Amino acid sequence: MATIEEIAHQIIDQQMGEIVTEQQTGQKIQIVTALDHSTQGKQFILANHEGSTPGKVFLTTPDAAGVNQLFFASPDLSTPHLQLLTENSPDQGPNKVFDLCVVCGDKASGRHYGAITCEGCKGFFKRSIRKNLVYSCRGSKDCIINKHHRNRCQYCRLQRCIAFGMKQDSVQCERKPIEVSREKSSNCAASTEKIYIRKDLRSPLAATPTFVTDSETARSTGLLDSGMFVNIHPSGIKTEPALLMTPDKAESCQGDLGTLASVVTSLANLGKAKDLSHCGGDLPVVQSLRNGDTSFGAFHQDIQTNGDVSRAFDNLAKALTPGENPACQSPGESMEGSTHLIAGEPSCMEREGPLLSDSHVVFRLTMPSPMPEYLNVHYIGESASRLLFLSMHWALSIPSFQALGQENSISLVKAYWNELFTLGLAQCWQVMNVATILATFVNCLHNSLQQDKMSPERRKLLMEHIFKLQEFCNSMVKLCIDGHEYAYLKAIVLFSPDHPGLENMELIEKFQEKAYVEFQDYITRTYPDDTYRLSRLLLRLPALRLMNATITEELFFKGLIGNVRIDSVIPHILKMEPADYNSQIIGHSL
């Protein structure tokens, strides 16, 4: 029976490369022969071959003076980990090891996050995991990832990193531990640290903020002593030791264009200086989440013209994957009814037929993926941005809203985006895990209470706002409101004629009355035995006016887009074509 060496010499005599199978073990062997006799140093490029399994590759000189064996440590021969064992080679001396990146095949620099990779793939994986970036593939999710094409598809590159053993947990665990001073409780995080909540959001422990013990909760003043956050802080539940981590500093926010949240961030970076709000002396509540990351807050760029911002937004919008969900249909695409001109108002149209159709009941929100192991400010900001975009798209899908004209539409959304967003929070209460998000905010205020980084007045104001959100969402959940009812409540809020500066207020008021009549008819048909249901639902709307839009921005968006105001982003959102919305935003039915 021929040995491996004998088989190798047979192939060498033929002066060619060939794949053979050892009869004794059934192992695949690839023999590659160097044809150049004069060259001392040889470079061998291994080609992937079908049907191959982990085995040996013999690299030899034509005269068989030196035999090099390459052992595969990875089952995928397209990106092998190569160990070169040199025999009879005086130049190379003892055995040497040459590693190739398991992801792209470039020269590896060592083991990173559980896999042997190059510096490029190491940095790419680290940025993707730490920023919780979500990528999309424009192909069939099987793009070629090698040294020269690894930057063409970030989605396939990240999937390949994970498939070859790069661990997301390793990225989190390599961060430096937080040093806590002796004067402070060991269970309290500094106000400049990042706070994380457990990944298992359905667990009872998920609703308990990290670093808040029962004794610390008892020491809290004002609203906390009154038991307002009893649903956020379940009694008798103890938290396990949590992991504190710090984000990368001064890393550019070149996020994935496949998420609408990245559009908000990218557009915010191009915002004009006049759109930046003036910060007061108090630190924002998300300061403890942002951990001093200047990539979101420092927007001291050159002043951009409106044309520059519009062109940049158009380019970003074109990069989004078109959605295929019925909720992404163009406004009025499947609507019934007609429009006619109102006497004396040639520029405005009033729509005949129902104000809302069944298509407006659809309100599906998909959370960012992959889900981070620890809830952080970037994930909260991305989730809130998706909800904001989805709410704007819902308004755009109403033909009567479009009939008001662009200026009126923008004015209405600027005036009532906070109310629409809050209704969306209540509607997506479970999908977004709003209770856990609010718990994170409360945790930050606990930290500021310990560190004395915020004035008592400011802290009280923020606590009151969080409580209002909690109370409103809880009351809406208890009412078991269906999709039709949420749609009519949003329409009544959207078509509110009492905002100063609006034109065609009579038409807006007619649309609101129409929404109310249709709402009443729906409840009468659907809940004939619940006489006071309509009244109970309408009485929840005044609570929306108590929500401060500026504080909502600070809680949900400031950690993602810095000082850029939502008002400056809304006109660009409303100018987007519905077909340009990313299908990733729409998926799971509520």
UniProtKB/Swiss-Prot annotation:
InterPro entries: NHR-like_dom_sf (IPR035500), NR2C1/2-like_DBD (IPR048245), NR2C1/2-like_LBD (IPR048246), Nucl_hrmn_rcpt_lig-bd (IPR000536), Nuclear_hormone_rcpt_NR2 (IPR050274), Nuclear_hrmn_rcpt (IPR001723), Znf_hrmn_rcpt (IPR001628), Znf_NHR/GATA (IPR013088). Sumoylation requires both PIAS1 and UBE2I. Sumoylation appears to dissociate NR2C1 from the PML nuclear bodies. Enhances the interaction with NRIP1 but inhibits interaction with KAT2B. In proliferating cells, stimulation by all-trans retinoic acid, activation of MAPK1-mediated phosphorylation and recruitment to PML bodies with subsequent sumoylation, suppresses OCT4 expression. One of its GO terms (cellular component) is PML body. Keywords: Activator, DNA-binding, Isopeptide bond, Metal-binding, Nucleus, Phosphoprotein, Receptor, Repressor, Transcription, Transcription regulation, Ubl conjugation, Zinc, Zinc-finger. GO terms for biological process: cell differentiation; negative regulation of DNA-templated transcription; negative regulation of transcription by RNA polymerase II; positive regulation of retinoic acid receptor signaling pathway; regulation of transcription by RNA polymerase II. A zinc finger (NR C4-type) spans 101-121, 137-156. There is a cross-link at residue 238 (Glycyl lysine isopeptide (Lys-Gly) (interchain with G-Cter in SUMO)). The keyword S-adenosyl-L-methionine does not apply. Residues 1-166 are annotated as: Required for interaction with KAT2B. The modification Phosphothreonine is found at residues 208, 210. The modification Phosphoserine is found at residues 185, 203, 568. GO terms for molecular function: DNA binding; DNA-binding transcription repressor activity, RNA polymerase II-specific; histone deacetylase binding; nuclear receptor activity; protein homodimerization activity; RNA polymerase II cis-regulatory region sequence-specific DNA binding; sequence-specific double-stranded DNA binding; zinc ion binding. Homodimer. Heterodimer; with NR2C2 which is required for chromatin remodeling and for binding to promoter regions such as globin DR1 repeats. Interacts with ESR1; the interaction prevents homodimerization of ESR1 and suppresses its transcriptional activity and cell growth. Interacts with NRIP1 (via its LXXLL motifs); the interaction provides corepressor activity. Interacts with HDAC3 (via the DNA-binding domain); the interaction recruits phosphorylated NR2C1 to PML bodies for sumoylation. Interacts with HDAC4 (via the DNA-binding domain). Orphan nuclear receptor. Binds the IR7 element in the promoter of its own gene in an autoregulatory negative feedback mechanism. Primarily repressor of a broad range of genes including ESR1 and RARB. Together with NR2C2, forms the core of the DRED (direct repeat erythroid-definitive) complex that represses embryonic and fetal globin transcription. Binds to hormone response elements (HREs) consisting of two 5'-AGGTCA-3' half site direct repeat consensus sequences. Also activator of OCT4 gene expression. Belongs to the nuclear hormone receptor family. NR2 subfamily. This is Nuclear receptor subfamily 2 group C member 1. It comes from Rattus norvegicus (Rat).
